[in-house]
Structure formats: structure tokens, C-alpha cells
A protein has these predicted regions:
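Conserved class I S-adenosyl-L-methionine
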Residues: 2-45, 56, 80
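Conserved donor sugar-nucleotide recognition element shared by glycan-biosynthetic enzymes
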Residues: 5, 24, 28-32, 74-77, ...
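Conserved Class I S-adenosyl-L-methionine
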Residues: 28, 54, 174-269
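Class I SAM-dependent methyltransferase SAM/SAH-binding core
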Residues: 46-102, 126
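A short acidic, Gly/Pro-enriched loop at the edge of an enzyme's catalytic core
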Residues: 100-111
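A short SAM/SAH-binding and catalytic strip from SAM-dependent methyltransferases
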Residues: 110-124
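Conserved catalytic/acceptor-binding region of the Class I
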Residues: 125-126, 132, 136-205, 225
Length: 269
């Protein structure tokens, strides 16, 4: 099992290293700031951002004065997060790491947060245990997870119809199902609030160009196209263009699409 797991994790790392995720993360900067605002962090709060990407969550938390540590599987993301924090003159620490084997002590953080990040780790039960382990008793685990029925969940489903996901890996969007999240944390949390929230993807170009944008910059989409021959790529492109067009709320040549996610805030018992 371990060699298979190592191979899967290597593929996942290659996927998230492909493209330039920061170009995608820009699209929900405002949503990330709103997510942080709802956490009502205080100066000095010790926060860990798991799978931090380029710092969408970590940086607004650092602006508030939280004591922020971010970690990500992809070294390029860690570097970008550091650079983004330095650009604003913020103090935050960023590490390369694995959500399933966090390199931090037990009970180290007041808040353990993850926005569209830890949900992609291949073993959700292991991930849940690690999020809890590094959180102080009475501290909070905060997650933003795409739902199966929301737009991004539908985009994943569309892509999977052309390029099946790795065998044996539970769908990441199951983290967007409240009952599943409650089952994964179980009695190890004393409370759990789950709320449907919406993020708007806004781009100053057409849905057709949005698909090309994702193909260029979003690792999972780039890898999906790379796994297909010319005809397969054309079919995937058409389906994704149709999906973005059907959900587009703009008629002026630009794109605005709403995507639901599940916001989870749990208190460690």
C-alpha cells in the first residue's frame, strides 16, 4: 500500500505544481477575505493554514495580526505565499508539508484552517485526524470545501467524465457534504457548524477564454487535458465551455459564475 500511496502523492504534487495556481486563486481573493472575517480572529491568535496555496487565507489573517503559519505540498506555492506576505510587509511563516503528516506539535494552534486545500488530500480520515491533532482543545478547525452540487463540484464531475480520478481515492467534494464531515470528525469535536456559502468567479473575458485560463494555470485541468488525445481534448474543452457558459451570469462578454461551498467551523473537544 505504501508504494501505491507514495506514487499517488507524487502525482498529486505534480498536479498542484503544474500551471500557476495563484492565477486561479486571484479569482476568489474577496471570498477568502470574507471567510477570514467570519473567523473573528484576534491579534496573536495562532493559526495554521493547511494547503495554503499562494496565501489567500494566510495573508488576510496576518493582516489582522494573527500569528500565522502556512503549509503546502507544492514548493512553488510556499514560495509565492512568502513573497506575497513580504510584499505587504507581513509576518507569516510558510513551510512545505503534507496535510496527512503535519510537521507540527500536538495542540499547537488556536485555529487550524483550510480553504479548498486539505479536501484534496487522498486519505480524508487521516487528514481529519491531523487537523484535530495540531489544534488546541477548545480551538477551532475551519474549512471551506467545494460541494458536489456547486459549480466547481460540477466542473470536477465534468472533467472526471473524460479523465477518471485515481482509483481508491474518495471524491474531494465529499468534504462538502455536512453529514460526511460530521462523520469524519465524530466525537472529537464538541460542536460543528456547517453553512452553505457562495464564491463568485469573475473574469474580464468570455467563458471560452476562462476554460483556456484554467487549462493554462489550474493544475488539475492542465493535467486532464494532457492525459487526452486531440479528439479527447476537444470533447473536454467543449463540455467545459458549455458548463461555464450555462452558469455565466453576464451577457457583456465577461464571465461571472457563482459556486457553492460548505463552510465548516468545528470546536475541538
Amino acid at each position: 500500500m505504501q508504494p501505491e500511496l507514495d506514487t499517488l502523492k507524487s502525482k498529486l504534487k505534480a498536479t498542484w505544481t503544474a500551471g500557476d495556481f495563484s492565477q486561479i486563486a486571484k479569482a476568489y481573493t474577496i471570498g477568502a477575505e470574507q471567510f477570514v472575517e467570519r473567523l473573528t480572529l484576534q491579534p496573536g491568535t495562532k493559526l495554521l493554514d493547511v494547503a495554503c496555496g499562494s496565501g489567500n487565507l494566510a495573508i488576510p489573517a496576518a493582516r489582522i495580526g494573527a500569528d500565522v503559519t502556512g503549509m503546502d505540498l507544492a514548493p512553488e506555492m510556499v514560495l509565492q505565499a512568502r513573497q506575497n506576505a513580504e510584499r505587504e510587509g507581513l509576518t507569516a511563516h510558510f513551510d512545505e508539508g503534507d496535510a496527512e503528516a503535519l510537521q507540527y506539535d500536538d495542540n499547537a494552534f488556536d485555529v487550524v484552517a483550510t480553504m479548498f486545500g486539505a479536501m484534496f488530500a487522498p486519505r480524508p480520515d487521516v487528514t481529519a485526524s491531523e487537523l484535530l491533532r495540531v489544534c488546541k482543545p477548545g480551538g477551532r478547525i475551519a474549512m471551506a470545501n467545494w460541494t458536489p452540487t456547486g459549480f466547481i463540484g460540477q466542473m470536477f464531475k465534468t472533467t472526471a467524465g473524460h479523465v477518471p480520478p485515481p482509483a481508491g481515492m474518495p471524491s474531494p467534494v465529499l468534504w462538502g457534504v455536512e453529514a460526511t464531515v460530521r462523520e469524519r470528525f465524530g466525537s472529537r469535536v464538541s460542536s460543528l457548524d456547517a453553512t452553505a456559502q457562495t464564491i463568485f468567479f469573475r473574469f474580464p473575458f468570455s467563458p471560452v477564454d476562462v476554460v483556456e485560463h484554467f487549462r493554462t494555470f489550474y493544475g488539475p485541468t492542465q493535467k486532464a487535458f494532457g492525459a487526452l488525445d486531440e479528439n479527447g481534448q476537444a470533447a473536454l474543452r467543449k463540455d467545459l465551455e458549455n458548463l461555464w457558459s450555462e452558469h455565466n451570469q453576464k451577457t457583456d462578454g465577461t464571465t461571472e459564475v457563482a459556486s457553492e461551498y460548505l463552510e465548516v467551523v468545528a470546536t475541538k473537544a
